[in-house]
Regions:
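Short, low-complexity disordered leader/linker segments with a strong preference
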Residues: 1-81, 388
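N-terminal secretory/targeting leader peptides
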Residues: 51-58, 74-166, 185-388
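Transmembrane alpha-helix boundary/anchor motif
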Residues: 45, 176-180, 228
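Hinge/lid segment of periplasmic solute-binding proteins
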Residues: 170-189
Length: 388
């Protein structure tokens, strides 16, 4: 299974964000390299002109004008290249490739993509800002990474809001509240294209298996620095311990913490199965990826090109969910091969965990931070109707 690009030595945190090399400094380096290339090209053009080739200079000028005209006419269905900034997730990378193929097909070859996966354009927050200002056309990132900017995304931090992936797909994303949250990206000058899957978070421990809520009592569990997450774990009896993700592997190896919780891909992608003996598929909170596009760029395209993007993205989204499920199965195989015991909760056990987490009142905490808390009430209403 490929979770981390084998050609680079990077660590990724529990938001799927690079904690290694691909940070803002590297973006600056990329820009410097690009500038150097442009300057070199300009020097070559100048030398050619000095050689007396006036016809070639005229041709070059005409080509430049043609390119400018082509760019300006993108709204008429002319060729356009979209820069896509992506994450480290294997399923998301697969889906971007799939999207690129489909959007090229459905646009009759007028749309191509320039794909920059593995946080090459910076972390989630940086790419979010780059897409707002037009430096990047489409970006993918964890909702947890940008909820401090887009407060309604805190709804996806509520523990046991969703009890299955199908609930997430049909209600969390496809319901009225989910659609309004996706549409809400427009306040940032962005077009919400889709919600993709980062996945359910699950518990791993190094000494004590967690099969019931009682097993969590006093367990020193590394968690995210998030008030909603902390309240839920305290309500379930654990001792939540925020810690830098970069320190987690060593902390588990040395017994500084008893365990941690993350999506399966993050667990095996960082080799946690090497220092943990047990994994319980608690599926306590589901974290999505957002997929957004610069609104001005989207609106500059022709109606046919916009339709091509919508159709290709819908198909790529279904494909991403399928790939995510495939990689999760491979992650379980990886853990078991390493000697880790993986336990799935039955419905009764999961409802026990949900009842304990609910006592932490995470929904109220989320609503306090949301700009549109009525969306939380609507989501709960839709889920209750869906479960009947």
């Amino acid at each position: 299974m490929v979770i981390i690009d084998e050609e680079v030595d990077l660590l990724y945190n529990d938001k799927g964000t690079c904690t290694g090399k691909n940070q803002k400094g590297e973006i600056t380096l990329m820009k410097k390299k690009a500038l150097a290339v442009l300057m070199a090209a300009a020097m070559v053009a100048s030398m050619t002109a000095c050689g007396g080739s006036s016809d070639k200079a005229a041709d070059s000028s005409a080509a430049t004008e043609d390119k400018a005209d082509s760019s300006a006419a993108a709204g008429d269905g002319e060729a356009v290249e979209l820069v896509v900034g992506g994450v480290t997730s294997s399923s998301a990378k697969d889906a971007v490739t799939y999207f690129g193929e489909k959007v090229n097909e459905y646009s009759n070859g007028t749309i191509t993509i320039a794909d920059f996966p593995d946080n090459q354009l910076g972390n989630d927050e940086q790419r979010f800002e780059m897409t707002q200002n037009g430096e990047c056309d489409i970006s993918i990132g964890s909702t947890s990474s940008v909820s401090a900017s887009y407060h309604d995304l805190y709804l996806y931090d509520v523990y046991y809001m969703f009890l299955s992936k199908q609930e997430v797909y049909d209600v969390g994303f496809g319901g009225e509240a989910g659609q309004k949250i996706l549409e809400g990206f427009d306040q940032f000058g962005l077009k919400g294209l889709a919600m993709w899957e980062n996945g359910f978070r699950n518990v791993t421990t190094n000494n004590t298996p967690v099969n019931t809520v009682a097993d969590l009592k006093g367990l020193k569990l590394r968690t995210m620095e998030n008030s909603i997450h902390l309240a839920a774990w305290k309500a379930m009896g654990a001792n939540p311990t925020p810690m830098a993700f970069s320190e987690l592997y060593t902390a588990m190896q040395q017994g500084t913490v008893d365990g941690e919780e993350n999506p399966l891909g993050i667990i095996t992608g960082n080799g946690f199965e090497e220092v943990e003996k047990y994994c319980t598929l608690t599926e306590h909170v589901y974290t999505p990826y957002y997929v957004v596009m610069n609104a001005d760029k989207y609106n500059s395209l022709s109606a046919d090109q916009q339709a091509a993007i919508e159709k290709a993205m819908a198909e790529a989204t279904t494909y991403q969910y399928e790939q995510s499920n495939k990689y999760e199965e491979e992650s379980i195989d990886t853990m078991e091969a390493a000697g880790c015991t993986v336990t799935a909760l039955d419905e009764a056990a999961k409802l026990e965990f949900k009842a304990a987490a609910d006592s932490g009142d995470g929904l109220s905490l989320a609503k306090e931070q949301m700009d549109n808390p009525d969306l939380a009430d609507k989501m709960v209403e839709e889920l209750e109707a869906y479960r009947k």
